[in-house]
């Protein structure tokens, strides 16, 4: 099993546990050059709130989407949008990535902006 298969296995197990708990899910999608986050409803089919470094207004404000500073802004923005939609309690789905760097920065910013997980 290589590194990517291990990450995908961890992500799958996390999503199964979150689905069994019937919780709203804050999912993080990380690439080499961008980061995005989405809050899904408990059924897992409806996106309640989303934010990404690929959004037009954010691309102009953020020089590079692959830094922790960009992740902080995305975390804050997705939390504000989720709270506005009435979602406060979420389960954090880090997509199998380590809780470190950009993932950690996004999570801490989301907590500071009002999400609880």
Curated annotation (Swiss-Prot):
PANTHER family the UniProt entry points to: 39S RIBOSOMAL PROTEIN L18, MITOCHONDRIAL (PTHR12899), LARGE RIBOSOMAL SUBUNIT PROTEIN UL18M (PTHR12899:SF3)
Subunit and partners: Part of the 50S ribosomal subunit; part of the 5S rRNA/L5/L18/L25 subcomplex. Contacts the 5S and 23S rRNAs.
Family: Belongs to the universal ribosomal protein uL18 family.
Keyword terms of this UniProt record: Ribonucleoprotein, Ribosomal protein, RNA-binding, rRNA-binding
Protein name, per record: Large ribosomal subunit protein uL18
Cystine bridges: none
GO BP term, example: translation
Organism: Polynucleobacter necessarius subsp. necessarius (strain STIR1)
